[in-house]
Every structure is written in C-alpha cells, then in structure tokens.
C-alpha cells in the first residue's frame, strides 16, 4: 500500500470493510473505479480512509434488530434458565447499537492494538485513546445497561489487543469483576476473542478440531488482520458449522448468568466486527445448528469458516456491552454437546426451513456426509420441449438429448418393429419418430443452399500478407444457351465439340490470359453443366466463384435452370454479370430477356438497376472484349486477395479415377500456394502430390491462388465439393483423414441400414401385395460429379413399389470386380461416359451380366425408369366398351330379357356389364346371353337393338342403363396405377 497505486480489495482489508462499501465511498468522492480489482492513488486512498472513519454504510442497520431477536430466542432455548434476565439486557443493548458502530470498531482494533495485562476485562480500559471515535458507539450499547458502563464504553475495548500467551489467568477474574466493568469489558473481549478465534480457525481449525471437541482450549491464533492476537478456540470443531458461532451470539445473553458452571478461563480478544455480513452468517449458523442436530460431524470446511469468521464479527458487536468474555468462553463449549449428544429443542424450530441447506454446506467434511450429499442431489432432468436434429446420431446421444433412458428408446422402437442396440446410429427420420414418441417437438434445421459459402479461406494471420489474385468466374445458365461456346470463343478452343450430345456434363476449369489497361492479367473460368440433373455441380461452381456470368439466350429467355443459377449466385453472395447470348439470331429479343430478368430482381444498369448486362454472340465472337472488361471491372471493385506465402487451402472441383494415373482431382487453390510433394487432405482422402497438370495439359510445380490444377497422388477419389488443406505433418494429416473416414463409414452404414430396414407394418403390407421389387445397380461414371448427378436423379424416381439399390457408385472404368459383384447380386452395370477394362466384357458375357453404357443422362434415366416399370406385375384395369338403354322387358320362362338399344360403343357377349337404375348399381356381372332378331350374336354395335339376358339377374325395368366393359391387363407405371 506504500506504492503509488492501491487496489480496492487491499484497502477494504485494511479498513475491515467490504469491497462494495469502499466502492460506495469511491462513488461519493467521484473516484472512477470499476471493480474491487481497480487501483487508486494513495491520495485517493487517504480520502477514503478519512471518510471511512466518519461515515460507513448502514445498510445492515435494519437487519440487526430482527436478527437479534432470532439470536435471543435461540440462545434462551440452548442456555440454562439463568440466562433469561441477561437476555433482556442484550436485546436492549443490541437494539440501541447502530450498525455503523460495529463497523467503526473494526479498523482501530486491528491496526493499533493496545498492550494489556493478563486480565482481559481490565485491559481494554487501558487504551481508550487509540480510537475515540469507536468508543462512542460502544457507549451507546452499554448505556442501557448501567451508568458505570458508560465511561467504560468510550475506551477502545474492541480494538485488537496484542497476542498474549496466558489469557487463561484473566478468565477467573472476569466473573469476580463488578457487573458494570464485566459487561463493558466483556463486550470488547467477546467480540475480540470470537473474531480472532474465527480467523484462527480459518488457518488452523482443521488440525485442532478433533482435540478441542471434548474440552475447550485456548490456542494462539494468527488473525487475518495485520495484528496477530491470541484467540480462544473452545469449539474449533464446531466453528466450520456456522450454527455454533451464531449460537454463541444468540446464547450469549443467557450464558452470562451461568459462568460458575463452566471453565471460565478463556477470554476472547475483540477483533473488528463486520456487521455487513451478519445476516448471511446468521442464516448459515441456523442451518449448521440444524445439521448438527441430525448428524454429528466435526470436520471443518474452509469456505464455511470464512463466512463464519466474517459474520461472527458482526454478531459479537451486538452483544459487546453485555457479555463478559468469561461467559462467552463458557457458552461455546456447550454447543458441541447440544449438537453431538442431544440437540436442543429450541434451535431446530427457527432453522428447520434451512435444514437441507445446512446439511450440504456445513454438516462436516466426512466421506459419509459427502455420499449423502450426492444421494440427496437428485439429478433429474426433464425432456426438452423441442430439439433440433441436424444430422444422424447414435441412440445414446439421442437419449442424452431427450434426457431419457436408452432402454426406453429401444423399447419404443422395438414395439414398432425396429430392432436396434445402444451403439447404432439413428437416421433423421427415425430420430424424429423417437422424439415425437416422447412428445418432444422436432424443429427442422434451416436448410442452407448448397452454394452458400460456409468456410472462410482467409485466416487472421493472412491479413498482413494479402496480395491481389485473379478472379474466379463461373459461367452459368440454362442448357443449350451457349455457355461452353462462349467460353470457347474466349479461349479460342473447341471444347464444345467434344461434349457428348453437345451438353456439358462436368465442370471445366480454364485460364484465360488477357490484357487490361496495358497490363497482362488472368481470369479463371469455371464452366458448369446446364442440365437439371447437375444441380450439385452448379451449386459447387457458385460456391467457389468470385463472379457469376449468367448466360441467357436472346431467343429463349429465362428458363428453369436460369432461375436456379440466379438462386445459386444469390446464395453465394457473388456479383452477377449477364451475358445475353445468340444476338446474331433473327429471333433475338434482348429487351424481353431484360424484362424477364428484372422480374427476378436483376435490373439492368440502363434501366436504373445495378446488374451489368452485355449482349454477345458466342459463335461470331461479337462484344466479347466488353464482357471481359466488365469482369475485370467487377473484380477490381471486389478487391480479391489471398496470401500466397502459406500452405494451400481450396476446394475439390472435380475428381475421377483414371485407368493409368489412378485417382485424379481437379483443385481450385483459394489461398496459399500448392506445390508438388505437399501432404494434402481432401475430405477423408489423404495423399502426397506426385504431379500437377494445368488446364492446357502442362506439368507445373506450384499453383498460386485462383489457379485450378489436376493433381495425382491421392489414395482414392475424393468427393467433389470437399475442401482440401495442406498439412506440414504427415502424421497430423493422416489422423485427420482417418477420423473423417470413420465418420463417413458410419454414415454410409447407417444409410445402408435405413434403406434395408423394414418395420412390421411394412412387412405385412408387402405380404399382401407381394414381395417388394428391387432393382440393383452398379454405377460407374467418368467423374465424381457425374456420379452425384446420377444418384440425385435416381432418388427423384418414385420408389414406392420398386426400390433402387445402388450397390456401388464410383468414378472409373468398369472392371471384372464390378462384373463379379453384379453377378452375385443380380445387378445391372451402368457405365456413364466410361469404358470397360480388359476382360470385363468377356466376364460379363460368361456371367450373363447386363452392361448398359450411356453418354447422355436423358437416355439413362428413361431406360432406368423403363426397367423399374418392367419389374412391376401387370395390372388388371377396367376398359369401357359401350352403353345401352333398356326400352322393354320380355318375360322368358322364370326370368326375363331386356330389350335394349345400344347408344354408344358396343356390347359384347361374355363381357362384364353394370346395370344402373338411377344412381344405384343393381347388378354387376357377366353378360350371359346376347341376341339380335332371335339370333345369338357375339357383339352388337351402337345404333342397333338387341336382347340381353343374365342368369343371375332378371328384375329389369325400363330406363335402366347398361354399361358394358371388360377387364384387361396393362403395364403399370411408376407414377401410379393405370386406369
């Protein structure tokens, strides 16, 4: 504190005040502090010390009278009958004793303790000059008792006396002293001794508690305060139990009359009381007394001792003027007896409401009590009202989320015909069903667009090393609107001629060198497919792009994939540049295109919007320079940058399995520099880069930001769209890859289980309709993106009656292993833009495996749908034949014959008829007899009359309508039953 700065909490310790009191003084003195850890200057500290001696917070003032009553009642019950007359005195003295008085007595005691003789009562009277300000409050407390006590009160009895080795000798003198002297001196010694004993207990109680239980002893203690004093520890064992300390204060008035019964040789030195915590101490004391009543535990718990210490200071102040030190020392020993042997009947009543808290906080530190505390702590969780399921989870995780037992979930699922164990993973649908079974609402997670950028490639460390990078431009739009042709015109190549069917079916990444403002520059173009099946590819292209070029044909306008491309670009939050293509055609209507785009929120600049629209002709190469200039202009506004001086990060654009080179992946480097020999992790795939090839087929040694290259050296084909990162440590990279691979494996197993899982209800339904049909497929494609597109298209096919099971889907050529798998499972091999390995076709012919090859996704989907329909059993449907009206009824034998006129179609013998009378069908069955002019005929066409007879129906009436129909078998479709 002699330094230039003083902390608030140090000042509060010095003044024996709480931190909040010091903060109040700071507020009054306009000293800017934030908390108890704030620092102030020594001058400001002096001001606070000055005001602290004059004015202290009086918040606890109103609490003292109430608490004093509690102590009085409790003390009366615990102590002998002789204490009652003294209780009234203590009550009046406490009521008249202000809160500020207690606080004012704190500091002088500790900082300037007077030396005194062995006799405790007489010693406080020897040093009245140390703190005249504090003697005045003491006089107030003693004044109700007697006039002779008033002169003794001004003397600083409560000021901390120096430690003395032999306080016991003063104890016998205390009972012999005059009443006035005993009361006044005991007020000081009582508070002194108790506070000191409590502070002593904080440090030494754990070791001395067992010794002091049978008999109170005087032990020298070192107080928390600067001045060391000696304290009596008659019940150190009880002190951690706050009720003992409180009991002393409560019982102090009554104990005064019974000193002869106790060994009164234990005077207590007064230490500055802290009345501000008295209320807390009293509550804990009551709790502790109740806990001791039910169970004896003498071990100390330090947190409680600290609270008792502080609170005890406050309570002793109230009884300062009345209680001699001898009576206090006598009062403390009986507490353990009442707690251990026979609890006093009076104490439980006020502390009963706090009994549970008492057991937990201060009943002792024994292992048995801790076990009881754990048992008494029922950790019962209630299920949440609603949960959000974002991914698959194990049954145990689901049980934790729902706060229910795993066995309950297993039981519920088993009752629904789903057998599962505790380690299995629940798919989303099953988890949702489980939650609903337990009345927990499931909130569907917010579906994020696949084009939304989820990962920030730049780190904080990169911000100081950023450099400009070329823009990545994605060409998007509807199929056949000229995206690849536009890119060809820019690159002056012929990519589109090599596309099957003239449509792009994978992403191509290309670099274009251009000159802008006299400086060479580069643009990286990503060409995405426009067919509806390649939504994932378009989303992936938009996710990694900086600028999106939306190609719209001037003669076709906005189409479905155009709208989807707009949504992808908006989800990725990238600027859009519209290229209105095919301006060289006669039917070009650029204004109509602009109008349609305006309806989608893309208003051209010439119309007052912010979207750049450039009319171009990809075939003739018209206006391409303007388009490139606009791209560079937008890229300058975007301020594209990256840090090339770090390990590379980026995204997998495409991946496939090459027959000669193995797994090949096309990467877009988004940050850092990729080099040959780097350890790379892409999703769950790890590898070491053996070679890198540019888009023009040239080998390169490194790839800077915004460059797309093909790499060789991966362990397997990664998933397109996965992000990759280069690691300096192969061990770290392998650990990350293995962890991701395990998660992917679990997910794949769960999907396989969910696709094969059947419930009891579904089994019964299949038993009624026949076995559920399955179409097994082995799918091989050229690149990973094509595999994704095909799988997505297959999932959109209706599979209510025929289920598609893809046993294997991977990029690469068709091998003999694939043929063996198809032969064992009765599957069809689908090859998309791929070839057959040597020996695969011969093996397929020997095994009788059907291999279908496609290069356009349209035909593939049509044939797959036809194969699924071929597995369906033909359906018998009703086909109408004709309609006739009954105009006469002729009785024949026992029955009758209807004379009819065929109104439409024809009526055929041995076919089915339905007789309607009004809106009611009176007969539905076979037509047994058909005659025309008394001759049996096979059929009668419309416009002719005929006679119709039925063996099982003869109640014809004129006006009946006869509907003729027949049942025929027709091929069923996946859309539904044929009608």
From Swiss-Prot:
It holds the Pfam family IF-2. Residues 581-584 are annotated as: G4. It is found in: Cytoplasm. Keywords: Cytoplasm, GTP-binding, Initiation factor, Nucleotide-binding, Protein biosynthesis. Residues 33-391 are annotated as: Disordered. GO terms for cellular component: cytosol. The keyword Transmembrane helix does not apply. Residues 234-252 have a biased composition (Acidic residues). Residues 263-278, 294-303 have a biased composition (Basic residues). Its main location: cytoplasm. One of its GO terms (molecular function) is GTP binding. Residues 314-328 have a biased composition (Polar residues). Signal peptide: none annotated. It comes from the Bacteria. Residues 477-484 are annotated as: G1. Residues 527-530 are annotated as: G3. One of the essential components for the initiation of protein synthesis. Protects formylmethionyl-tRNA from spontaneous hydrolysis and promotes its binding to the 30S ribosomal subunits. Also involved in the hydrolysis of GTP during the formation of the 70S ribosomal complex. Belongs to the TRAFAC class translation factor GTPase superfamily. Classic translation factor GTPase family. IF-2 subfamily. This is Translation initiation factor IF-2.
């Amino acid at each position: 504190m002699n330094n230039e700065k003083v902390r608030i909490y140090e000042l509060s310790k010095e003044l024996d005040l709480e931190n909040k009191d010091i903060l109040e003084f700071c507020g009054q003195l306009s000293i800017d502090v934030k908390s108890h850890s704030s620092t102030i200057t020594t001058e400001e500290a002096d001001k606070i010390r000055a005001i602290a001696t004059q004015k202290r917070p009086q918040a606890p003032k109103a609490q003292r009278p109430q608490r004093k009553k509690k102590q009085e009642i409790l003390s009366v019950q615990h102590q002998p009958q002789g204490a009652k007359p003294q209780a009234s005195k203590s009550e009046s003295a406490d009521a008249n004793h202000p809160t500020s008085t207690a606080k004012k007595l704190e500091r002088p005691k500790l900082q300037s303790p007077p030396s005194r003789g062995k006799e405790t009562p007489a010693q406080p009277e020897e040093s009245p000059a140390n703190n005249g300000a504090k003697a005045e409050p003491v006089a107030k407390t003693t004044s109700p008792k007697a006039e002779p006590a008033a002169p003794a009160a001004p003397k600083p009895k409560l000021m901390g006396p120096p430690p003395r080795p032999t306080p016991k000798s003063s104890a016998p003198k205390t009972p012999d002293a005059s009443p006035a002297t005993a009361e006044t001196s005991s007020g000081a010694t009582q508070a002194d001794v108790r506070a000191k004993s409590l502070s002593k207990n904080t440090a030494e109680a754990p070791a001395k508690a067992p010794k002091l239980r049978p008999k109170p002893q005087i032990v020298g203690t070192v107080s928390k305060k600067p001045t060391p004093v000696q304290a009596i520890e008659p019940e150190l064992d009880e002190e951690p139990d706050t009720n003992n300390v409180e009991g002393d204060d409560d019982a102090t008035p009554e104990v005064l009359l019974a000193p002869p019964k106790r060994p009164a040789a234990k005077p207590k030195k007064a230490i500055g009381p802290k009345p501000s915590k008295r209320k807390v101490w009293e509550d804990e004391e009551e709790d502790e007394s109740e806990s001791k009543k039910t169970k004896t535990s003498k071990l100390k718990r330090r947190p409680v001792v600290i609270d008792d210490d502080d609170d005890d200071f406050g309570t002793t102040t109230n009884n300062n003027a009345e209680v001699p030190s001898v009576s206090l020392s006598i009062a403390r020993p009986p507490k353990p007896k009442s707690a251990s042997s026979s609890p006093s009947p009076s104490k439980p009543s006020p502390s009963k409401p706090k009994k549970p808290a008492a057991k937990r906080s201060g009943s002792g530190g024994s292992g048995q009590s801790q076990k009881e505390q754990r048992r008494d702590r029922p950790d019962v969780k209630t299920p949440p009202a609603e949960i959000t399921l974002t991914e698959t989870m194990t049954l145990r995780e689901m049980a934790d989320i729902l706060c229910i037992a795993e066995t309950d979930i297993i039981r519920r699922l088993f009752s629904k015909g789903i057998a599962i164990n505790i380690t299995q993973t629940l798919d989303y649908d099953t988890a949702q069903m489980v939650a609903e079974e337990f009345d927990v609402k499931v909130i569907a997670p917010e579906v994020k667009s696949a084009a939304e950028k989820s990962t920030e490639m730049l780190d904080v460390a990169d911000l100081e090393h950023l450099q400009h990078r070329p823009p990545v431009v994605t060409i998007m739009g509807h199929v056949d609107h000229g995206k690849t042709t536009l890119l060809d015109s820019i690159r002056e190549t012929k990519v589109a001629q090599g596309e099957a069917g003239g449509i792009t079916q994978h992403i191509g990444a290309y670099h274009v060198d251009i000159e802008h403002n006299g400086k060479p520059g580069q643009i990286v173009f990503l060409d995405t497919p426009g067919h509806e099946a390649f939504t994932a590819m378009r989303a992936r292209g938009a996710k990694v792009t900086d600028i999106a070029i939306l190609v719209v044909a001037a003669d076709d306008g906005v189409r479905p994939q155009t709208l989807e491309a707009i949504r992808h670009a908006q989800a990725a939050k990238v600027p859009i540049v519209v290229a209105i293509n095919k301006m060289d055609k006669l039917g070009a209507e650029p204004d109509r295109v602009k109008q349609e785009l305006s309806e989608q929120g893309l208003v051209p600049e010439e119309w007052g919007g912010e979207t750049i629209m450039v009319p171009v002709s990809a075939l003739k190469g018209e206006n391409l320079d303007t388009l490139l200039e606009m791209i560079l202009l937008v890229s300058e506004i975007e301020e594209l940058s990256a840090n090339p001086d770090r390990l590379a990060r980026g995204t997998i654009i495409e991946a496939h399995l090459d027959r000669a080179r193995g797994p090949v992946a096309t990467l877009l480097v988004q940050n850092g520099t990729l080099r040959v020999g780097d350890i790379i992790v892409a999703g769950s795939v790890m590898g070491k880069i053996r070679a890198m090839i540019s888009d023009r087929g040239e080998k390169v040694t490194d790839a800077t930001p915004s460059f797309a290259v093909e790499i060789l050296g991966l362990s397997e084909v990664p998933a397109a769209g996965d992000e990759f990162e280069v690691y300096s440590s192969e061990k770290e990279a392998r650990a990350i890859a293995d962890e991701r691979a395990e998660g992917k494996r679990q997910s794949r197993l769960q999907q396989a289980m969910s696709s094969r899982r059947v419930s009891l209800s579904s089994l019964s339904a299949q038993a009624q309709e026949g076995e559920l049909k399955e179409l097994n497929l082995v799918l091989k494609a050229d690149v990973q993106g094509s595999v994704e597109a095909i799988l997505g298209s297959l999932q959109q096919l209706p599979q209510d009656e025929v289920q598609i099971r893809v046993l294997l889907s991977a990029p690469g050529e068709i091998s003999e292993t694939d043929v063996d798998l198809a032969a064992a499972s009765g599957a069809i091999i689908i090859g998309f833009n791929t070839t057959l390995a040597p020996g695969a076709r011969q093996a397929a012919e020997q095994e009788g495996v059907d291999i279908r090859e496609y290069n356009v996704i349209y035909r593939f989907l049509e044939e797959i749908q036809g194969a699924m329909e071929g597995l369906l059993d033909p359906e018998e449907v009703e086909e109408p034949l004709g309609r006739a009206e009954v105009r006469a009824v002729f009785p024949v034998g026992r029955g009758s014959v209807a004379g009819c006129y065929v109104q439409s179609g024809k009526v055929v013998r041995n076919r089915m008829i339905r007789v309607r009378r009004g809106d009611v069908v009176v007969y539905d069955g076979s037509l047994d007899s058909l005659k025309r002019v008394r001759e049996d005929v096979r059929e009668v066409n419309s416009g002719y009359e005929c006679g119709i007879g039925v063996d099982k129906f003869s109640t014809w009436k004129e006006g009946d309508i006869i509907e003729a129909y027949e049942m025929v078998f027709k091929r069923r479709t996946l859309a539904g039953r044929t009608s």
